[in-house]
Structure formats: structure tokens, C-alpha cells
Amino acid sequence: MILSNDSLVAFHYRTYGTFFLHKNRLHNIYRGFTHYKYYRAGNFPLFSSSLSFLLLILFKENDIIVVMEKKKLRINMLSSSEKVAGQGVSGAYRELVRLLHRDAKDQLIVTENLPIEADVTHFHTIDFPYYLSTFQKKRSGRKIGYVHFLPDTLEGSLKIPFFLKGIVKRYVFSFYNRMEHLVVVNPMFIEDLVVAGIPREKVTYIPNFVNKEKWHPLPQEEVARLRTELGVSDNQFIVVGAGQVQKRKGIDDFIRLAEELPQITFIWAGGFSFGGMTDGYERYKKMMDNPPENLMFPGIVSPERMRELYALADLFLLPSYNELFPMTILEAASCEAPIMLRDLDLYKVILEGNYRGTEDREEMKEAILEYQANPVALKDLKEKAKNISREYSEEHLLQIWLDFYEKQAVLGRK
């Protein structure tokens, strides 16, 4: 290669970045093998668009200007979750992508829904076009599937015709089997996947997390203003629940509690994310249209409004019968709302006693009255919520994801 004395050449490496050098300051060049693209900058001949060689530069101090990036992994995210508002998968997806864009830009190049080569392709939803893409010969790197649900967990959520249930189940597990590795947000899913024939070593548990810049407590004066706007006095006890309006969320118990405790204000944020496909849609719609006077249904709300509702909560209650890994619990904990739950096996594993567990509606009722009468006990429960927030912080989960992607990318090259 011939350069004029004043030519500035920029070699842009596909993975390693860019460096600049002047011919008259070049000390030594060794030949070898790597792939590069060049940009013409000055008076030098045209070359073919790619060439294989290795450029090793030995230079004196200040002789060559070098700007070189450390090799980055390319992670391509595939997700349609944000097409459906008010459900946890979209929230978990956006939190992960936002965290990686913000804090892992030195290690990763993160793209979304692009038909490109990548070190890792991360499937967040099980769309049929994504399923078909797993059969294409083009390089997608290591295929990682995110398991947010199992076929059985759809019971009580979506209204699926009986004759389709078997087809849906086979499709879901076929999709998961197309993946080279699976990530579960619920550790209880691991055994179910193993029973379905997926090797245990092919599954990794990585929990959800939330952004503390987005989900945080509000000042007391702001809470007082919100109570005034809502028409609720300072000493009125408020119980907040959140999630899709579905049978499995325990919405029936939440409504019954409001009926049995007229002196307590109840608020349920959420709606029908899947419209008429929601199991029990007509019945729950009638309930929402005619709630008890002390029960409010604001519907699907913005994150900003949801943060305000968590701030209003004297107690956050999620009476679900079946859960995956609810983002609402992490959001409420990050906003320092005391948390009461139906005592599912999942919570015993992931929350380790940092909540008030209840077995049924009667225990929930007794606990609400107990906390209304005992501010000290409520304050203790609030401190436990802070423990949840620390355990599922961004800082803790960021390194877990970086290590996971690095390991999977290495396996994908073998």
C-alpha cells in the first residue's frame, strides 16, 4: 500500500474499532490476517473493499494517534412485548434494554428487532416469525430464549378454546426447544422445563429488576397533594393492587375485601391488556363498571401515575393465585411500599420473608386491619420492602447479564 506523506488513513475494524496513522510517522508494519474496511482520505490508490491481513504497529511515544475500542459483543433483541400495554413482559424487556444501553455500552452493542448477524440473538417473545427465523441459515449467533410463561400459566389469563390448548402447548415447548439456552424469570419453571424434556443445564435463572431512577419514593408533601386530589383524608388507609384484571391475579378477592372493609380505600391499577381474549372478560368488565364506592379502577396507567399510586399505598396487596415474577412487586418495593401477598411457593424462594404472607382472603382482611391499627408493624414491613429493592437492583443484575452474554457468545463460536 502506497501513501503520500500527508495522507491520513482510517482503518475501521469490524469488531475492534478505528485507529489513525500518518505514513511519515509509521515505525513498523507486520503482515498477517484480519478483516478491515478502509476510508480514502488523501492521495492513495483505490483498493478492493476488503482484504485479509493483520496489522501490527510498533511505534514510538506520540508517533501514532490510536483510538481503539475493545471488542464488543453484538446482542440482537427480538420482542413484540411492547405492542401490548399494561403487562409485565414489556416492562421487564424495556428495563433490560435500557440498562444495557446505558451501562454496558463499552461491552455490548445492543440492537432491537433487526435482521442482522449477532453474537447472541435474545428471543423475548415467541412470535411465529421468530420461530421461523430459527431455521434460517444466516448467522444469528447463540439463540437465547426468555421464558416468561409456561402453557399451564396461561390458565386464568387468556381464554383459549379447548381444541387449541394442545396446539398452543406443543408450539410453546417447540419454540423453547429451538433455543440453545433458556433464561427463566421464575426459578419454579426449571423443573417444569426439565419434565418437558429440556436439559437442566440448558436453563439459567436470572430474575427481573427495576430502575430506581424511575421507581422511587415520593416526598411526603407530594403524597399529601395526591391524597387531596384523590379526595382521601390523611388518616384514610389505602390498599393498592396492580396487574392485569384476571382471575389468576386474585381480583375477585380484592373486590370482596373492598366490599367487606368499606372504611378502607382500595385502588387496583390495570386493565384488560388482551381485551376480549382475557379469561372472564365480560364478568370482570361489569365489576369494574360497578365497583363498591371505596374501590377505584383507574385502568392501565402510565409509569408516572403508577409511581404515584405506589406512593399513596399504605399497603401494597397482590392476591395472585399464580405468578411468574411480577414486576409490580419490585416496583412497589423500590417505591418503599409495604408488601402483602398470597403466600405462594415462588415468593418463599425469591423474596425470603420480606413481605407479609397470607393464605386466603380472611387472613388478608385480618392483616389489613392489623396494619391499619399498628403503624409500628407497618413501618417494619416497609423496611422489609427495602430489602427486596436492594436484592433486585440494577447494579446487581447488570454484571449477571454481562457474564451470561459473554459465556453464551463463547459457546456460540464453538
Model-derived regions, located:
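Membrane-proximal helix-turn-helix segments that form the acceptor-binding/catalytic region
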Residues: 163-182, 285
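Conserved donor-binding/catalytic core segment of Leloir-type glycosyltransferases
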Residues: 227, 233-249, 255-259, 267
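Glycosyltransferase donor-sugar binding loop
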Residues: 242, 265-282, 299
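Nucleotide-activated donor-binding/catalytic signature segment of Leloir-type glycosyltransferases, i.e.
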Residues: 280-304
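Short alpha-helical donor nucleotide-sugar binding micro-motif in glycosyltransferases
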Residues: 300, 308-313
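Aromatic "clamp/platform" in nucleotide-sugar-dependent glycosyltransferases that forms part
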Residues: 321
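Short hydrophobic beta-strand element within catalytic cores of glycosyltransferases
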Residues: 338-341
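Conserved acidic donor-binding segment of nucleotide-sugar-dependent glycosyltransferases
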Residues: 353-363, 369-376
